Protein backbone atom coordinates (compact mmCIF):
# COMPACT_ATOMS: atom_id res chain seq x y z
CA UNK A 1 0.00 0.00 0.00
CA UNK A 2 1.25 3.47 -0.85
CA UNK A 3 1.33 6.09 1.89
CA UNK A 4 1.11 9.84 1.36
CA UNK A 5 4.17 11.69 2.69
CA UNK A 6 5.09 15.36 2.83
CA UNK A 7 8.49 16.69 1.82
CA UNK A 8 9.82 19.22 4.32
CA UNK A 9 12.66 21.63 3.54
CA UNK A 10 15.78 20.87 5.56
CA UNK A 11 16.71 24.55 5.98
CA UNK A 12 13.48 26.45 6.63
CA UNK A 13 11.30 23.52 7.81
CA UNK A 14 8.29 24.27 5.60
CA UNK A 15 6.36 21.45 3.91
CA UNK A 16 6.40 22.50 0.24
CA UNK A 17 5.62 19.23 -1.56
CA UNK A 18 3.76 15.95 -1.05
CA UNK A 19 4.05 12.57 -2.80
CA UNK A 20 3.34 8.87 -2.28
CA UNK A 21 5.74 6.15 -1.19
CA UNK A 22 5.60 2.35 -1.12
CA UNK A 23 6.85 1.39 2.36
CA UNK A 24 7.50 -2.25 1.40
CA UNK A 25 10.13 -1.41 -1.22
CA UNK A 26 11.52 1.86 0.24
CA UNK A 27 12.11 1.36 3.95
CA UNK A 28 14.50 4.32 4.49
CA UNK A 29 13.56 7.97 4.83
CA UNK A 30 13.00 9.68 1.47
CA UNK A 31 15.44 12.57 0.73
CA UNK A 32 15.48 14.54 -2.53
CA UNK A 33 16.74 17.93 -3.73
CA UNK A 34 13.86 20.21 -4.75
CA UNK A 35 13.25 23.93 -5.15
CA UNK A 36 12.21 25.77 -1.98
CA UNK A 37 10.10 28.83 -2.88
CA UNK A 38 10.72 30.43 0.53
CA UNK A 39 14.51 30.39 0.16
CA UNK A 40 14.39 30.65 -3.66
CA UNK A 41 17.01 27.91 -4.18
CA UNK A 42 17.33 24.13 -4.38
CA UNK A 43 17.60 22.44 -0.97
CA UNK A 44 17.28 18.93 0.47
CA UNK A 45 13.69 17.97 1.26
CA UNK A 46 13.13 15.14 3.74
CA UNK A 47 10.18 12.85 4.33
CA UNK A 48 7.60 13.70 6.95
CA UNK A 49 4.33 12.06 7.88
CA UNK A 50 0.94 13.59 7.04
CA UNK A 51 -1.48 13.22 9.94
CA UNK A 52 -4.73 11.44 9.20
CA UNK A 53 -7.46 13.21 11.06
Curated annotation (Swiss-Prot):
Keywords: Ribonucleoprotein, Ribosomal protein. SUPFAM superfamilies: Zn-binding ribosomal proteins (SSF57829). GO terms for biological process: translation. GO terms for molecular function: structural constituent of ribosome. It holds the Pfam family Ribosomal_L33. The keyword tRNA processing does not apply. Coiled coil: none annotated. Gene3D superfamilies: Ribosomal protein L33. InterPro entries: Ribosomal_bL33, Ribosomal_bL33_CS, Ribosomal_bL33_sf, Ribosomal_zn-bd. GO terms for cellular component: cytoplasm; ribonucleoprotein complex; ribosome. Belongs to the bacterial ribosomal protein bL33 family. This is Large ribosomal subunit protein bL33B. It comes from Sorangium cellulosum (strain So ce56).
Amino acid sequence: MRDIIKLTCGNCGRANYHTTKNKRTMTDKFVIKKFCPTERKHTEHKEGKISKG
